[in-house]
């Protein structure tokens, strides 16, 4: 009889966990509080190790349809604009690590994973069903949903976000979120609206006192993702 993992949360981590379990020969039963799956946020960078795993799951074509492949990483001074360091990406990553270094919008990555999970017969997706309580972990792992449904499995994966109700139950109060002392401001701009001189197919990092900023293309170069991180209270 196949083992079954119970997954709390249907975001990027939850969908990836379900696919990983499925490809490892497990059944995966995923529970998501929202009735409609969606992913908010902006861009994310995926190193070659992640891309190799997505390729192993048969997602190379889906990834290519939505991701960008930056050609280099450039670090600049936020004060002078001077180039401090650079490193090749693009084909250099493929030759060295066997896969590209890509940048992608989080919503696009979630769509790729969700679509792949829906095609797997051993992944059971349950929207509108929040995992509310962990009942036991002795003989089997037992959970109760917010609708008072009791479900048993062989393992539990918590992927229900930074405000998880179950993580403190499993790991204790020290696992609760803490203020980092940094604030992140994010934006997405159509590449066509950016002055030509600022458009690039690069990951650019601007380094300055008590701050740094990063921008890179997403959505096959049609959008630029920007994040500025500064020190400050929450």
Q: Where do the language-model regions lie?
A:
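Conserved N-terminal glycine-rich FAD pyrophosphate-binding loop of Rossmann-like flavoproteins
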Residues: 35-55
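A structural signal for isolated positions on well-ordered beta-strands in alpha/beta enzyme cores
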Residues: 6, 29, 124, 214, ...
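A short secondary-structure junction signal
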Residues: 167-170, 197, 227
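Conserved Rossmann-like nucleotide-cofactor binding loop
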Residues: 13, 36, 163
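Conserved N-terminal helical subregion
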Residues: 2-5, 22, 49-170, 175-190, ...
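Active-site substrate-recognition segment that forms the wall
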Residues: 200-234
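Short coil/loop residues immediately preceding or within conserved phosphate-binding loops
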Residues: 2, 25, 41, 70, ...
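N-terminal Rossmann-like FAD-binding beta1-loop-alpha1 element of flavoenzymes
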Residues: 3-30
């Amino acid at each position: 009889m196949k083992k079954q993992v119970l997954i709390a949360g249907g975001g990027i981590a939850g969908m990836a966990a379900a696919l990983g379990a499925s490809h490892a020969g497990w059944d995966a039963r995923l529970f998501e509080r929202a009735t409609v799956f969606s992913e908010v946020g902006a861009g994310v960078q995926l190193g070659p190790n992640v891309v190799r795993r997505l390729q192993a799951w048969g997602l190379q074509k889906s990834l290519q349809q939505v991701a960008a492949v930056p050609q280099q990483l450039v670090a600049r001074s936020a004060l002078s604009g001077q180039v401090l360091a650079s490193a090749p990406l693009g084909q250099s990553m493929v030759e060295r690590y066997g896969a590209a270094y890509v940048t992608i919008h989080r919503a696009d990555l979630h769509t790729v994973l969700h679509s792949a999970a829906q095609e797997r017969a051993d992944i059971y997706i349950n929207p509108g069903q929040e995992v509310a309580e962990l009942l036991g972990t002795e003989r089997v792992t037992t959970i109760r949903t917010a609708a008072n449904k009791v479900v048993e499995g062989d393992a539990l994966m918590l992927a229900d976000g930074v405000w998880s109700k179950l993580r403190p139950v499993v790991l204790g109060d020290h696992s609760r979120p803490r203020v980092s002392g940094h604030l992140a401001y994010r934006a997405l701009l159509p590449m066509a609206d950016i002055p030509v001189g600022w458009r690039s197919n690069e990951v650019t990092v601007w380094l300055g006192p008590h701050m740094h900023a990063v921008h890179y293309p997403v959505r096959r170069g049609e959008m630029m993702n920007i994040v500025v991180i500064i020190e400050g209270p929450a």
